[in-house]
Amino acid sequence: KNFSAGPSKIPEIVLNQITEDIKDYKKSGYSILELSHRSEAFQEIVSDVKTKFVKLLNLPNDYDILFLQGGATFQNTFIPANKPSLKGNISFLLTGTWGRKTLKDFEIYYDHKITNYSLEENFSENIFENLQEVSNEYVYLTSNETIEGVQVRDFQLLNNKNLIIDMSSDICSYEFGWDNISYIFAGAQKNLGIPGVTV
């Protein structure tokens, strides 16, 4: 039994398919590990996974999907490095360990010019109703703080905000609307697959 807080258990049917594809991918005579990332076969794999993600997440047409190397913590530098306009224009809603860790990394990029609201004491989603005055254009939060046991699902309680959400431990486990979401990310190993890739 695998009850690890990190990599999740992989279903036997998936392990069997992986084993088969490692030996001979779709009876092509070569292993899936030997595919060039520029090959048509590999591009078909990526396209198929993207199509399934769009369906799973009810993703609107004006969003795109990125498959990135490494774990979700890499997003702590990837996002600020690629979005310098967030400096002075992002607030953090802190509900636990992972949000605090991300805040520290963001502060390095943004010269500590980040507003943060600690919601860790006596947390409930009703607290969000008192945060309508958050003035910054972007708001960052962690949807499921696994160490503290705090989960946020009703993102609509934060109206008219561009949310950036770490959904590493609960992505694809419930439905949510995209009306006020700009960017979500998740390490694959909790709910989606094996370690080493972030969506």
Predicted feature locations:
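General beta-strand structural signal in soluble alpha/beta enzymes
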Residues: 2-4, 65-69, 92, 114-117, ...
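Gly/Ser/Thr-rich loops at beta-strand to alpha-helix junctions
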Residues: 8-10, 70-75, 96-99, 146, ...
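Short, charged, surface-exposed secondary-structure boundary motifs
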Residues: 101-102, 122-128, 172-176, 193-198
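Active-site PLP attachment segment
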Residues: 181-199
